[in-house]
């Protein structure tokens, strides 16, 4: 194995010092639409349904959607110009949080890096589910919003139905952060807090320019687990980390 390959492997397989379990409540402030495939929808179904858990049929927010949105917002905030860089050319701070593949989109070699952040699919909180299932909604725990586009030349209308998660719904938010270098935890948490702040000033899902997908984050908590150093982070320090993340949210 070459020195370069060994160096790459070391970067990909950094020592795991511990884990931070980050939790919060994500509240839907305006109707949310993260689309699911409608290729096999029955006649009379909604034109554009939202993504659901296949077992419970409840709406979910895919972890991939949240990860992609946070990363894109952070990269856009750091980039001058209109063209975003290839993922392999993201800043070191972004790459260590979100990871980077060995090959870029152009097929060229990049510096592969394992993501320190592990995302989860967000599911409705139990209290929110109990509240929403009692409402008379157009679909199961969903509302229908009619949208329309008008052809400027022919004046022909193109109405369609968009399924949304109703405003007021709350999801259980969770991230796990891998501690690899203790001296980088504060910087990583500050960057994550910036991303969460940007998210709440932007939108999640589709049709954001029309007012969809505004969200807020509340009630951050952080817990710590480590086999090698179980007492390395005090509760006071964990509360400080939660406060840093909450600067992008709102405390309640």
Regions found by a protein language model. Name each.
Residues 2-149, 154-252:
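RNA-binding basic/glycine-rich loop and surface signature characteristic of RAMP-family CRISPR effectors
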